[in-house]
Amino acid sequence: MSSPEAVRTVHVYSMHTDPFAQPGSGDAGGMNVYIAQSVRAMLTINPQLKVEVFTLNRTPQAPERAHVEDPEWGSRLVRHYIDVPAAREATKNDLAEYLEDFAQSCVTQAMNVPDVVHAHYWLSGWAAVQADGVWSRRLFPGRVPDGADGSGSSDGSGEHRLSTRAVAIFFTPHTTAAAKDARRGPGEPTEPRIRHSIENRLPAFVDGYIVNTPLEAEELVQSHPSLSGRISIITPGVDTDIFRPLPGVHPDHDTSETRCRIVFAGRPQPLKGPHLLVEALALLPRDLQVELDIIGRSESDYEQRLLERAAELGLADQVRLKDPVPPEELARIFRSADIVACPSSSETFGLVALEAQACGAAVLASDVDGLRFAVENHRTGLLVAPRTAERWAVAIERLVRAPYLRHSLGANAAARARSMSWESTARKTLDVYETAVPVPRPAET
């Protein structure tokens, strides 16, 4: 493969979540935005490209048809909704039980044989390996040895699969079990054993990894030396047509040194940390009037527990829970916020932080992995460590009492975001696809 046009068909696997679902609800978040935006940008760059996206049909809102053409891109972007009835009520961590069914359906429902499969998250990564075994048996009968589809043993080098593969596989983890467990905070569950097992095996079966930051790449190579030279670092982008400052539009309490509205946007769950913000508000000096808007839903009892805790702390009138909103409305909320807070225990990048900065918002974020790259400390936002309510209270008070600092951080952040586009992300991703060794195909295919 020597030019972007050499890759004609890409299959994107996102087993556990629909990339085109509303971010901030259920399992939909930054990964969904990343996939949807990069796919659309790739289609713009390469007019010959066709993309098929595969996801489980897990919600009542999913189309009843097995596949739908995208309203904007038509047959160039087809969304496949794989129906595995038993998986509809399963939690994300229980979906591994249905990997084989999902992988088989990805092959049987495909409209074209892919040149590349790009799998997102550990479930999809293993589904891609299993699907490659199905493609291999279909395209090259009798040629697939034990272990080529992940079913047997491997020495970790990947030589078995790479010598017999039917398609090139690229994998973006978005998170890893090892990283999440190492950074998890109090009350956050450990990752399931099967996830650790699969993520330890994946390096032997994929052509390459695509990650967001140098830290992510470094940690992967430390855990899996065989990945050295097979990891590409591609920074996510931001849609600055939507997420941008507007002339004459200012935060709600633009010049106040005592009043402030904080916005948290994302799925409310322990690892995202909105509970830290509730606890921090209770520690602020009494002369400060600080409100917190939590934008998102997690389909659990976590939100109710947040509201109950706020009431216990006397903050019932200061903490509000709101439904997730479309990008245009989210951008409006960011522009009106005095502070946007991202108190996660771990993020591979932190798209919410980047989108908020693109709107000119002052951002507070945990000083952890990917957020260190999304936010330039003391220039486009402030990083908070350690990840405690006490430290977050100190950081919030600092920004509330310094409107000039909020203005400076927001201006620098908006300027930086203008240089980070999804077009750049997509172009680099297409270049990585081209590094795969082409697979000779039988003449009849």
List the model feature ranges, each with a label.
Residues L215, G237:
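Carbohydrate-associated surface elements
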Residues E291-L307:
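Glycosyltransferase donor-sugar binding loop
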Residues C260, F264-L283, Q304, E390:
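A conserved mid-protein helix/loop that constitutes part of the nucleotide-sugar donor-binding site
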Residues N377-H378, L382-A389, R398-Y404:
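Conserved acidic donor-binding segment of nucleotide-sugar-dependent glycosyltransferases
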Residues S345:
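Aromatic "clamp/platform" in nucleotide-sugar-dependent glycosyltransferases that forms part
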Residues A362-A365, V375:
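Short hydrophobic beta-strand element within catalytic cores of glycosyltransferases
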Residues M1-D70:
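N-terminal subdomain of nucleotide-sugar transferases
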Residues P324-V325, R332-A337:
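Short alpha-helical donor nucleotide-sugar binding micro-motif in glycosyltransferases
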